[in-house]
Curated annotation (Swiss-Prot):
Subunit details: Component of the small nucleolar ribonucleoprotein particles containing H/ACA-type snoRNAs (H/ACA snoRNPs).
GO CC term, one of those recorded: box H/ACA snoRNP complex
Annotated organism of origin: Debaryomyces hansenii (strain ATCC 36239 / CBS 767 / BCRC 21394 / JCM 1990 / NBRC 0083 / IGC 2968)
Region (RGG-box 2) residue spans: 135-213
Keywords: Nucleus, Repeat, Ribonucleoprotein, Ribosome biogenesis, RNA-binding, rRNA processing
Stated name of the protein: H/ACA ribonucleoprotein complex subunit GAR1
Annotated region (RGG-box 1), positions in chain: 5-17
Length: 215
């Protein structure tokens, strides 16, 4: 399984932010998400923060008790959802609708990081090629099916939040992990994890997950 470190081509996991070593809870925590439901032992949340969390970022209660880590990021960029892999001893179904979860401020990325850059208009001066240089190379056009500014797909078989969301999520959205976990979305909703996690949505299937990779 290709777990690249640069550019959203992984699944879950990846770097957790500036520091790789956790030394207890941070001095301050910010609201990150609100509980929606449990799903196969994971906690499904709606983001209430304008920024995007790192994969594997620790998630806390308001009293800074750690309850788990960010597992997946799903949905279009204007309506982000994420799942939490609970810590040992934490039961996903012990929470109720609306319960809030928190994150350290150093584990967040600005949304602009995932948005497409505006096109530049006007003619650009032609660059002179270096002597002996050929016309091509192996450069691509950037990206790898990850959608415009979102997370693409990891494939797999754990299902996906989304209707037609598959193969890399929507333009500017976050995929899931392939498959048919159900789905909250419509055309570019949430990708999935394969399998059949039951359903939040319509056609669920074929959702791609995180083909944009990791942080």
């Amino acid at each position: 399984m290709n777990r690249g470190r640069g550019g959203f081509r992984g699944g879950r996991g990846g770097r957790t932010g500036p520091s790789q070593f956790q030394q207890g809870p941070p001095d301050t925590v910010l609201e990150m998400g609100a509980f929606m439901q449990s799903c196969e032992g994971d906690i499904v949340c709606r983001s209430i923060n304008v920024k995007i969390p790192y994969f594997n970022a620790p998630i806390y209660l308001e009293n800074k008790t750690q309850v788990g880590k960010v597992d997946e990021i799903l949905g279009p960029v204007n309506e982000v959802f994420f799942t939490i892999k609970p810590s040992e001893g934490v039961q996903a179904d012990s929470f109720k609708d609306g319960d809030k979860f928190y994150i350290g401020p150093d584990k967040l990325l600005p949304l602009e990081r995932f948005l497409p850059k505006p096109k530049e208009f006007g003619t650009k001066p032609k660059k002179k090629s270096a002597g002996g240089a050929g016309r091509g190379g192996f450069g691509g056009r950037g990206g790898a099916r990850g959608g415009r500014g979102g997370f693409g797909g990891r494939g797999g078989s754990r299902g996906g939040f989304g209707d037609r969301g598959g193969r890399g999520g929507s333009r500017g959205g976050f995929g899931g992990r392939g498959g048919s976990r159900g789905g909250f979305g419509d055309r570019g909703g949430f990708g999935g994890r394969g399998g059949s996690r039951g359903g939040f949505g319509d056609r669920g299937g074929r959702g791609g997950g995180f083909r944009g990779g990791r942080f």
